[in-house]
């Protein structure tokens, strides 16, 4: 057994106590080492040897007191004593005393200091220590009067709200760099529709025929609806007189001889519309032609035209007065021989097939429509062998 004396050991306080605050509250009943209760000190009063690395990376043995407090206010010095503990006895080795430090009450305590580099190094090596990254004095220091939070001014003098005078033109957009006021200061300016706007809207609809049709689908006729369009879409005079109240005359029952007596060109194509300037007939001649048409075209009278053969024989004509404008025939007329009285007449064989009305949706061949004749138009009348009307 070796006899160790105080000359074999050297105790150095690496970190001196600087200041402390009076500790309060009850002490812990369970202690790692049972010692006699102290009237002045609180916390862990005993520490074991820790083999740690110093800040210069050298090995050393350190006694760390991380939970040591003073319960009395005043100025004190700490005394550390080194003991060697054996199985059956404890040997005193050496003692060291710290520098003087002040224990202050909580009201006058300036605050905890920042953890030193040595404490951080021990904490990194596994020692349980409370590390403070910044001093507590910076967190709990008194606030100066000039550091109080100043309220934000409602409006700086340099930036005032620009009041825009009311204008009736509304010509352009507002400038993007202007300063707007707060929402609660004045109500938003709304644009009210004036009589000028209504006039512009109605003028737009008058010019554009499509707008007029959408606004009033049951209004004026088509000719009045498109009255404001450019002259590039002019309609012939014969087509402009149509409206919803007029009745289209029946052109399917017209005789070619009547068309010749009225002075109309029977050889015009079906899709061709005559020029209104070329019509030299007067209104009296047109009315006379229409009257002759209605007198000769009685219900049940057979018609020589193929379109008339498709209509029912008992089709009742409308009693409304016909239009003053007569359109060209729908199909090309045939050259029928004229009689001695100057009027053209034609006859065809009234067979049961010819008397049967044929609707446009039914299929019909050329033989049923023209009495099985593919050559020039001839009619087999009972009175003449060659088809010449008597």
UniProtKB/Swiss-Prot annotation:
A motif (Nuclear localization signal) lies at residues 273-280. Coiled coil: none annotated. It is found in: Nucleus. Disruption phenotype: Results in a severe conidiation defect with reduced sporulation. InterPro entries: Velvet, Velvet_dom, Velvet_dom_sf. Residues 350-364, 371-390 have a biased composition (Polar residues). GO terms for cellular component: nucleus. Residues 3-132 form the Velvet domain. The keyword Transcription applies. Residues 165-175 have a biased composition (Low complexity). Keywords: Nucleus, Sporulation, Transcription, Transcription regulation. Component of the velB-VosA heterodimeric complex that plays a dual role in activating genes associated with spore maturation and repressing certain development-associated genes. The complex binds DNA through the DNA-binding domain of vosA that recognizes an 11-nucleotide consensus sequence 5'-CTGGCCGCGGC-3' consisting of two motifs in the promoters of key developmental regulatory genes. Belongs to the velvet family. VosA subfamily. This is Spore development regulator vosA. The lineage of its organism: Eukaryota, Fungi, Dikarya, Ascomycota, Pezizomycotina. The gene is vosA.
């Amino acid at each position: 057994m070796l006899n160790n004396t105080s000359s074999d050991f050297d105790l150095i306080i690496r970190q001196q106590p600087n200041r402390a605050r009076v500790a309060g509250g009850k002490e812990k009943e369970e202690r790692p080492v049972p010692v006699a209760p102290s009237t002045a000190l609180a916390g862990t009063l005993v520490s074991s040897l820790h083999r740690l690395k110093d800040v210069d990376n050298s090995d050393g043995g350190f006694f760390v007191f991380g939970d040591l407090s003073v319960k009395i206010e005043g100025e004190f010095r700490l005394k550390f004593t080194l003991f060697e503990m054996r199985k059956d006895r404890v040997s005193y080795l050496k003692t060291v005393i710290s520098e003087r430090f002040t224990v202050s009450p909580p009201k006058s305590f300036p605050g905890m200091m920042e953890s030193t580099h040595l404490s951080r190094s021990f904490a990194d090596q596994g020692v349980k220590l409370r590390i403070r990254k910044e001093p507590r004095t910076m967190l709990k220091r008194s606030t100066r009067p000039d550091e109080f939070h100043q309220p934000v001014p409602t409006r700086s003098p340099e930036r005032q709200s620009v009041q825009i005078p009311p204008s009736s033109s509304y010509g352009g957009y507002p400038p993007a760099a202007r300063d707007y006021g707060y929402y609660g200061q004045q109500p938003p300016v709304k644009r009210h529709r004036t009589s000028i706007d209504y006039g512009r809207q109605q003028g737009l609809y008058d010019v554009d025929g499509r707008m007029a049709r959408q606004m009033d689908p049951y209004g004026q006729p088509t000719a009045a609806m498109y009255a404001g369009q450019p002259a590039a879409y002019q309609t012939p005079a014969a087509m402009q007189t149509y409206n919803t109240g007029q009745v289209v005359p029946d052109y399917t029952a017209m005789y070619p001889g009547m068309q010749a007596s009225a002075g109309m060109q029977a050889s015009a194509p079906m899709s061709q519309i005559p020029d209104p300037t070329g019509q030299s007939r007067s209104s009296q001649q047109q009315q006379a032609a229409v009257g002759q048409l209605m007198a000769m075209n009685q219900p049940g009278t057979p018609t020589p035209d193929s379109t008339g053969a498709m209509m029912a024989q008992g089709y009742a004509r409308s009693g409304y007065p016909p239009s003053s404008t007569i359109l060209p025939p729908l199909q090309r007329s045939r050259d029928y021989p004229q009689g001695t009285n100057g009027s053209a007449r034609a006859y065809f064989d009234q067979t049961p097939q010819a008397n049967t009305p044929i609707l446009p949706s039914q299929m019909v061949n050329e033989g049923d429509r023209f009495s099985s004749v593919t050559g020039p138009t001839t009619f087999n009348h009972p009175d003449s062998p060659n088809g010449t009307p008597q």
